[in-house]
């Protein structure tokens, strides 16, 4: 079967079964994440970049995500016996002239840390970097608690999402009007 991470699928088909397949593609890694973002914003988004605070990505962010399509992405800890997690932010420039930022954290040590995630819309065009990561991580992020969360993102957009609590995490997000 073809690799899923780094691809675009129909937004309506995004779900846990697809994200489980993305996790499986990452192999036997103790800290990893499969991410799906469904674009139901009414406009398109174009990938800017991914910034990894810890860990890495094996695939490139899908470049162009039309309305009613979902992007699939993944991250994992660095290979080898290293005490790192998969912690990052990535950014998409939206056709409305603003930037969609997504942050996720799958830590190495669950004695001190938990899974966290957040989504934010930034005015204008902004690449993901340490500042964007910190803005969302230290802002008011959602815990990866196996529960659905939603909020108003501003600019006429809403977000609904869920992240699992495991070291092999799934993050599913829907951006809508």
Swiss-Prot record:
Region (N-terminal region) location: 11-30
Keywords: Cytolysis, Ion transport, Membrane, Nematocyst, Secreted, Target cell membrane, Target membrane, Toxin, Transmembrane, Transport
Source taxon at top rank: Eukaryota
Residue sites binding phosphocholine per the record: 54, 87, 105, 107, 133, 137-138
Compartment(s) where it occurs, according to its Swiss-Prot or TrEMBL record: Secreted; Nematocyst; Target cell membrane
Oligomeric and partner information: Octamer or nonamer in membranes. Monomer in the soluble state.
Name under which the protein is recorded: DELTA-stichotoxin-Hmg2b
Provenance organism: Heteractis magnifica
